[in-house]
């Protein structure tokens, strides 16, 4: 294969896109156009009938790859020396191999193919561009500067046009980037909406999960309470003899305590009743057993009550000592018992007023004793039963 034939085809197609003033590169968006120019060359050769060719050169999949590259890398600069590597990475075949395999019956591009397609002549774009540059230089340059070198004039015009071209390219690049930014913002907003939707779903799922956990805990608590119930089958098998025996023992102890307190209350009440009967019989019959009654009276009264009663009696006797003669006259005048009864009764029992005073103090001591005894019994009963 002649390297010159492939280079001529490639340079021809490259020159249709690349501008001499912009540098030795094309943009990524121009890649499909470059491939289309090469395909047009081979289609014209097939129409002329000079060569048998395998067309199309590129499949639809490869063309889709070229279009995707041009859309994603619109302003990516493809330099001429980097084109082979970029093309091979896209279709996994070099461009030279694809063009050579297009010819049927030969293994390389025929040398007369270049002449028949008139690929040696410079492109019309380059010729027209050169004519415009020379015309523009002659028109825009003032007469006083015609003495300057034509090369300098052309270089100045080329620099200005190059700058204009670069500005236009930058504007297009900026517009494309702005559109990409808008598209990205739209995608970001959509992603935010989807994220919020997923967050709401996650929150609802988490709430349901917590509700299920709570329901599970409630069921577990109910099951545990059922197992701890004494009537449940798990507890019925436990030996309850010890518990019942303890209950019986405590009940028996409380019953004994109640019986003991009842007996004590009966004894104390019986003693008080007997004391009341004795005092009543003394008041009614005025028996001569004064000393024995006085001893019983002393033993029945507590020590502190006895002291109070003694003080009261002493005070009463001191008061009555001065008026005793008058009392005797009054008593003997109204109450004249027989000689036998006077001998049987004590001197104070023969007096109605003195006997009433003594029996009044004795009744007071009996009532205080009974009240104190009942209070002690009530306190003991309250301590036993925790009242």
Swiss-Prot record:
InterPro entries assigned to the protein according to its UniProt record, in alphabetical order: Mps2
Transmembrane segments: 311-327
Disordered: annotated segments: 216-235
Membrane topology term: Single-pass membrane protein
Coiled coil start-end: 117-232
Subunit structure: Interacts with BBP1, MPS3, and SPC24.
Family classification: Belongs to the MPS2 family.
Annotated protein name in UniProt: Monopolar spindle protein 2
The encoding gene: MPS2
């Amino acid at each position: 294969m002649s390297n010159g034939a492939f280079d001529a085809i490639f340079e021809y197609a490259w020159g249709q896109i690349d501008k001499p003033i912009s540098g030795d590169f094309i943009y990524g968006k121009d890649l499909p156009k470059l491939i289309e120019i090469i395909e047009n060359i081979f289609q014209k050769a097939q129409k002329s009938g000079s060569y048998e060719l395998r067309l199309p050169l590129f499949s639809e999949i490869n063309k889709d790859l070229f279009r995707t590259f041009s859309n994603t890398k619109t302003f990516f600069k493809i330099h001429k020396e980097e084109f082979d590597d970029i093309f091979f990475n896209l279709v996994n075949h070099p461009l030279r191999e694809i063009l050579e395999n297009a010819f049927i019956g030969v293994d390389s591009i025929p040398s007369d193919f270049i002449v028949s397609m008139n690929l040696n002549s410079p492109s019309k774009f380059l010729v027209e561009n050169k004519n415009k540059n020379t015309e523009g230089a002659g028109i825009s340059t003032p007469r006083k500067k015609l003495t300057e070198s034509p090369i300098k004039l052309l270089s100045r015009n080329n620099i200005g046009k190059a700058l204009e071209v670069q500005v236009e390219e930058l504007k297009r690049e900026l517009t494309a980037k702005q559109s990409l930014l808008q598209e990205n913002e739209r995608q970001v907003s959509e992603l935010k909406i989807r994220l919020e939707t997923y967050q709401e779903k996650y929150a609802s799922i988490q709430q349901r999960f917590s509700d299920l956990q709570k329901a599970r805990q409630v069921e577990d608590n109910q099951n545990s309470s059922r197992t701890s119930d004494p009537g449940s089958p798990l507890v019925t098998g436990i030996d309850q003899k010890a518990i019942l025996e303890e209950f019986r023992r405590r009940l028996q102890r409380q019953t004994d305590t109640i019986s003991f307190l009842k007996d004590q209350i009966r004894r104390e009440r019986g003693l008080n009743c007997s004391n009341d009967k004795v005092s009543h019989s003394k008041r009614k019959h005025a028996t001569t057993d004064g000393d024995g009654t006085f001893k019983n009276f002393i033993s029945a009264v507590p020590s502190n009550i006895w002291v109070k009663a003694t003080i009261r009696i002493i005070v009463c006797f001191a008061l009555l000592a001065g008026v005793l003669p008058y009392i005797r006259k009054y008593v003997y005048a109204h109450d004249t018992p027989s000689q036998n009864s006077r001998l049987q009764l004590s001197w104070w029992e023969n007096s109605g007023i003195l006997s009433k005073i003594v029996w009044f103090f004795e009744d007071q001591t009996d009532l205080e004793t009974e009240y104190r005894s009942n209070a002690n019994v009530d306190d003991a009963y309250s301590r036993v039963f925790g009242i």
